[in-house]
C-alpha cells in the first residue's frame, strides 16, 4: 500500500518543489505566528500557486481565532486545515474546509475516545507530547501507545527522520507520515538530500 507523506514547515518555494519532485502528497504551512517556521498566508499562497494537482496545501493552526482561520485559509489557498492546539470539535468543524486534528500522545490519553470526539475530522495526526509545546518537538513517542481499532485514519508524526522512518512504518503501519525537522538544516529550511533519503526509506516500505 502506498504511504502518504506530508512535509511540514515549508517556508520556501524551492523546498516545496523539491518535496513535490520526490513525490510527497501534501505540503504543510505553519500559520501560527509564534512558530519558528511561521509563514504568512500571503507567502504561503505564492507557493501554493505552483503546486501541481493532487498535492494538498495544509495550513497548521494552534488555538486560532475563527477569523484568522478564515482569512489565512483564503489567502493561502488551503485544501486542508490542521488544528494543533486545544480546539474543540465544534470549532474545528465550522469551516468550509476539511480538517485533521493533531493529538500529543502520552500515557493515560484514551486515543479511542479522542477519535470518537473528533469523528467529523478526516483523521488524527499523532505527535509527541512535550510540556508547553504544541508540536515540532523533534522527538518520537512510544508507538506502542497507538491502539488498534482507531475509528479514524491516522498520520504518524513526531521525530521522524531517515534513520528511523523505516522502523516507524514497519512497527505502526500508518496511513501517512508527517515530517518537518527530520529533513531540515535549520528551522523552516529543508535539505534536498535529506528529503531524498527520507522518501527512499518510505518507498522501500511499500508493498512489503
UniProtKB/Swiss-Prot annotation:
<dbReference type="InterPro" id="IPR001240">
    <property type="entry name" value="PRAI_dom"/>
</dbReference>
<keyword id="KW-0028">Amino-acid biosynthesis</keyword>
<dbReference type="GO" id="GO:0000162">
    <property type="term" value="P:L-tryptophan biosynthetic process"/>
</dbReference>
<dbReference type="InterPro" id="IPR011060">
    <property type="entry name" value="RibuloseP-bd_barrel"/>
</dbReference>
<protein>
    <recommendedName>
        <fullName>N-(5'-phosphoribosyl)anthranilate isomerase</fullName>
        <ecNumber>5.3.1.24</ecNumber>
    </recommendedName>
</protein>
<keyword id="KW-0413">Isomerase</keyword>
<keyword id="KW-0822">Tryptophan biosynthesis</keyword>
<keyword id="KW-0057">Aromatic amino acid biosynthesis</keyword>
<dbReference type="GO" id="GO:0004640">
    <property type="term" value="F:phosphoribosylanthranilate isomerase activity"/>
</dbReference>
<dbReference type="InterPro" id="IPR013785">
    <property type="entry name" value="Aldolase_TIM"/>
</dbReference>
<comment type="pathway">
    <text>Amino-acid biosynthesis; L-tryptophan biosynthesis; L-tryptophan from chorismate: step 3/5.</text>
</comment>
<comment type="similarity">
    <text>Belongs to the TrpF family.</text>
</comment>
<dbReference type="Pfam" id="PF00697">
    <property type="entry name" value="PRAI"/>
</dbReference>
<dbReference type="InterPro" id="IPR044643">
    <property type="entry name" value="TrpF_fam"/>
</dbReference>
Amino acid at each position: 500500500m502506498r504511504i502518504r507523506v506530508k512535509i511540514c514547515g515549508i517556508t520556501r518555494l524551492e523546498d516545496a518543489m523539491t518535496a513535490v519532485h520526490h513525490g510527497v502528497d501534501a505540503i504543510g504551512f505553519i500559520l501560527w505566528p509564534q512558530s519558528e517556521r511561521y509563514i504568512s498566508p500571503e507567502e504561503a499562497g505564492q507557493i501554493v500557486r505552483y503546486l501541481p494537482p493532487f498535492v494538498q496545501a495544509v495550513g497548521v493552526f494552534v488555538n486560532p481565532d475563527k477569523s484568522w482561520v478564515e482569512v489565512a485559509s483564503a489567502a493561502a489557498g488551503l485544501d486542508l486545515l490542521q488544528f494543533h492546539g486545544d480546539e474543540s470539535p465544534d470549532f474545528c468543524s465550522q469551516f468550509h474546509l476539511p480538517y485533521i486534528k493533531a493529538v500529543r500522545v502520552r500515557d493515560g490519553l484514551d486515543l479511542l475516545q479522542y477519535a470518537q470526539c473528533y469523528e467529523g475530522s478526516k483523521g488524527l495526526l499523532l505527535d509527541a507530547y512535550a510540556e508547553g509545546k504544541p508540536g515540532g518537538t523533534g522527538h518520537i513517542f512510544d508507538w506502542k501507545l497507538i491502539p488498534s481499532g482507531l475509528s479514524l485514519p491516522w498520520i504518524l508524526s513526531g521525530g521522524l527522520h531517515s534513520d528511523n522512518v523505516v522502523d516507524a512504518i514497519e512497527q505502526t503501519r500508518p496511513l501517512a507520515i508527517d515530517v518537518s525537522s527530520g529533513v531540515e538544516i535549520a528551522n523552516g529550511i529543508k535539505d534536498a538530500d535529506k528529503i531524498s533519503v527520507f522518501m527512499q526509506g518510505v518507498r522501500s516500505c511499500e508493498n512489503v
